[in-house]
Amino acid sequence: MIMLTGGAISWKSRRQDCVSLSTSEAEYVAASQCGQEVLYLREILRDFGFAQAAPTEVYEDNLACVAMSENPVRRKFSRHIDIRYYFVRDLVAHQVMKLVPLRTHNMVADQLTKSLPAPALVKHRDVMIGRVPFCARSLCSATSVSGG
């Protein structure tokens, strides 16, 4: 889900086309697909005269996925991942987007992929429609992010 000025402007929820061997790989594939949308929307904003100087923050609840996006070395556990998904690394290296750790229970997009308890659903819905501001700065904590 991509948000601009407090409201969701783009979202997608579907099964992935490939089989992932780990949650980190699945998150990395999703981040790559998100990166394509980020690149497209940044170009639209630039065409309208709103060029983005800072990287677009993409919130991720999987620390291994964040680490893979920042490290250009292919490791033993990630060497089987299709090269096309390393598009994320290019976007991060060129400062188009940045993966930012966020606690799992604060992921607004979870309402598109998971069955949530009513209080969480209401909280995420209110953020998604812009009723309540999303303040990631107070929610982010690299030391307390849980995977999955």
What does each model-found stretch correspond to?
Residues 1-6:
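Acidic, metal-ligating active-site segments
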Residues 14-148:
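RNase H-like nuclease module associated with reverse transcription
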